[in-house]
């Protein structure tokens, strides 16, 4: 049999339980990751006087996520075919060439090469 507690002790135990449940009910707000700020920066570089609606931003964010997933999957496949365990810039570049059509692939590769060069020179 559990030990009997006095009336005051039982009330205190009940209050302690209530305080714990109140703090547990507070949910931490999870941060939602998005490319919105980067999409907005590019938009302002290309068309400084143009805005973007939240729905259009959501579509653009989905588009960027989709393209990145496709490039990552293709690069992974290429590394697997060549019996490599590391995805390098070479696999990414080849994946971009395979996924994007013609002139778009050329521009993407040149911009990517420029970004990698800038990053390595800043280190």
Curated annotation (Swiss-Prot):
InterPro entries: Histone-fold, Histone_H2A/H2B/H3, Histone_H2B, HISTONE_H2B_site. The modification N-methylproline is found at residue 2. Gene3D superfamilies: Histone, subunit A. It holds the Pfam family Histone. Its main location: nucleus. PROSITE patterns: HISTONE_H2B. GO terms for cellular component: nucleosome; nucleus. One of its GO terms (molecular function) is protein heterodimerization activity. There is a cross-link at residue 118 (Glycyl lysine isopeptide (Lys-Gly) (interchain with G-Cter in ubiquitin)). Phosphorylated by the catalytic component of the Dbf4-dependent kinase (DDK) complex Cdc7. Keywords: Chromosome, DNA-binding, Glycoprotein, Isopeptide bond, Methylation, Nucleosome core, Nucleus, Ubl conjugation. It is found in: Nucleus; Chromosome. It comes from the Eukaryota. Core component of nucleosome. Nucleosomes wrap and compact DNA into chromatin, limiting DNA accessibility to the cellular machineries which require DNA as a template. Histones thereby play a central role in transcription regulation, DNA repair, DNA replication and chromosomal stability. DNA accessibility is regulated via a complex set of post-translational modifications of histones, also called histone code, and nucleosome remodeling. This is Histone H2B. It comes from Drosophila yakuba (Fruit fly). The lineage of its organism: Eukaryota, Metazoa, Ecdysozoa, Arthropoda, Hexapoda. The gene is His2B.
